[in-house]
Amino acid sequence: MVASSQKILVTGSAGFIGTHTVVQLLNNGFNVSIIDNFDNSVMEAVERVREVVGSNLSQNLEFTLGDLRNKDDLEKLFSKSKFDAVIHFAGLKAVGESVENPRRYFDNNLVGTINLYEVMAKHNCKKMVFSSSATVYGQPEKIPCVEDFKLQAMNPYGRTKLFLEEIARDIQKAEPEWRIVLLRYFNPVGAHESGKLGEDPRGIPNNLMPYIQQVAVGRLPELNVYGHDYPTRDGSAIRDYIHVMDLADGHIAALRKLFTSENIGCTAYNLGTGRGSSVLEMVAAFEKASGKKIALKLCPRRPGDATEVYASTAKAEKELGWKAKYGVEEMCRDQWNWAKNNPWGYSGKP
């Protein structure tokens, strides 16, 4: 157990992965300070975190409304508290939107993060867990994806993650006292087992499971399946889906590594299950979990979508002592539990 006196700053903490990670941080005895600008999230998510952990642990949680692009917001936060490490989730993540509006992505994802590094350095907080993505592998030439593969990005969102990885490597190389872990997520799905926390995207979902979920509760008429002629077992694309609670535990493992490993430098780890599931397999699993029929519309492939992507998890298992515990069945069970209890997400209304 890590001493509970350690204080962690979590940026973008009201988002899907942020909320679930904050719950696990509190459950593991950390003091947590969170900052979010609610660009793509809501205050209700923070209230639900408090509800899930209970009143005792909630006392170890502080919230600040703020934006990383405003350095004053960060200055105030770091002047008020001494942080032992930062988990940095804040950023925009919709591929399609990034293609249409790349400047918005460069402003949010790059400027915000550069400000964060500057203020961290000024206040001598030099331990960071960074939220990267499997998008940095682009169209991988072979699978599974191993951390030392050549990196490439297929869109502006992916490029921001790639740039930010490179920035992290450059900073750590120039200032070796920094310890940075880059976590490359594959496809986070599922929800907290309580049914009180889950993914609540604004507008039409960009990811498969929230889309399936919205069809199941009647918010959308059908699921668009992009590509049904891939050279896979059922013609649909294959991805590595990982339960969000496994992902949250991966962040705890990464933090422990930062605190215990002096020579971590700047190191990347995949967080996935190491197994691929097709779109149609995920639909079938969700239908089984929910008892609902999901209407499908077969559409052409989207440009830039890879046929099959899944993680090699050997490095995270060996060096972080972390391994995904949940399978597709549990992912769909928990996703449906969240959906049926919150058909309209956190707002509770259309």
From Swiss-Prot:
Pfam families: GDP_Man_Dehyd. Its EC number is 5.1.3.2. GO terms for biological process: galactose metabolic process. This is UDP-glucose 4-epimerase. GO terms for molecular function: UDP-glucose 4-epimerase activity. It comes from Pisum sativum. The active site is at Y157 (proton acceptor). Belongs to the NAD(P)-dependent epimerase/dehydratase family. One of its GO terms (cellular component) is cytosol. NAD(+) binds at residues 7-38. Pathway: Carbohydrate metabolism; galactose metabolism. It comes from the Eukaryota. InterPro entries: NAD(P)-bd_dom, NAD(P)-bd_dom_sf, UDP_G4E. Substrate binds at S133. Its cofactor is NAD(+). Keywords: Carbohydrate metabolism, Galactose metabolism, Isomerase, NAD. It catalyses: UDP-alpha-D-glucose = UDP-alpha-D-galactose.
